[in-house]
């Protein structure tokens, strides 16, 4: 018993989890009172949505924050997937600062990017103009957005979305259309501090292929590698998937 305790005592303490940088001027999250009324729940949700919008506007448009936590190159899985494909219509859900949308536009795709962070979309539009390409952007919460039916040849979910997106993706894709997903494996929570308990972009082993396979999509590629995350730039376990609508 002593030897075990001594060995444990010699181990280095666990490294602190890394979270999102604080947003200047944004105080602590509002607290929902005990036994809240429907009106209080609605107001709390509104306040949290507004804080989320402010947080992402800051992280995605502040040059120092982008350099610290974001890969400014297009997602590698996306680049590999579309190489050699005939360009078509693409939806970049929760687009952010536009790195993937702009890349697709440069390859000839007609891209629509949707996000709640209006400043990030404006930043993306400016970058697109500088690079001489056109993208369409819409300020919207993807949870309330009309994805359409048989509308897109490609849907991109790069560190974006939630479990409820699977059915919407299946409905929105054209026959033969692809969805490209990269997100965090749940193991990444050992190193990342999850803001507000929001695990929408964290998935358990084989959770993604089960979710999307259940919608009738064909899983073309699935991996759970250790790699540098596009968001956070840390070495973490990731989930990567490409699926196709029959």
Residue ranges and their predicted role:
Residues 145-154:
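A short acidic, Gly/Pro-enriched loop at the edge of an enzyme's catalytic core
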Residues 117-119:
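Conserved SAM/SAH-binding beta-strand->alpha-helix loop
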Residues 131-142:
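Conserved SAM-binding strand-loop segment of SAM-dependent methyltransferases
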Residues 160-173:
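A short, conserved alpha-helix within the catalytic core of class I
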Residues 16-85, 87-96:
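Conserved class I S-adenosyl-L-methionine
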Residues 110-115:
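Conserved SAM-binding motif I beta-strand of class I
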Residues 176-188:
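Conserved beta-strand signature within the Rossmann-like core of class I S-adenosyl-L-methionine
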């Amino acid at each position: 018993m002593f030897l075990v305790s001594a060995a444990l005592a010699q181990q280095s303490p666990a490294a602190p989890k890394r979270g999102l940088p604080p947003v200047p001027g944004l105080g602590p999250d509002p607290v929902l009172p005990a036994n809240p009324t429907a009106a209080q729940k609605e107001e709390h949700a509104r306040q949290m949505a507004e804080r989320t919008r402010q947080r992402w506007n800051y992280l995605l448009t502040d040059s120092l924050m982008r350099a610290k936590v974001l890969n400014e190159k297009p997602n590698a899985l996306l680049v590999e997937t579309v190489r050699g494909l005939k360009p078509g219509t693409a939806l970049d859900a929760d687009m952010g600062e536009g790195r993937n949308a702009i890349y697709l536009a440069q390859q000839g795709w007609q891209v629509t990017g949707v996000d709640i962070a209006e400043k990030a979309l404006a930043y993306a539009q400016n970058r697109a103009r500088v690079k001489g390409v056109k993208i369409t952007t819409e300020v919207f919460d993807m949870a309330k957005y009309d994805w359409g039916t048989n509308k897109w040849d490609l849907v991109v979910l790069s560190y974006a979305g939630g479990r409820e997106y699977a059915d919407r993706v299946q409905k929105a894709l054209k026959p033969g259309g692809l969805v490209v997903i990269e997100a965090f494996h749940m193991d990444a929570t050992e190193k990342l501090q999850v803001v507000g308990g929001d695990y929408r972009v964290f998935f358990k082993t084989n959770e993604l292929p089960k979710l999307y396979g259940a919608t009738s999509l064909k899983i073309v590629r699935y991996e759970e590698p250790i790699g540098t995350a596009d968001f956070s730039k840390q070495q973490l376990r990731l989930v990567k998937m490409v699926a196709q609508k029959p």
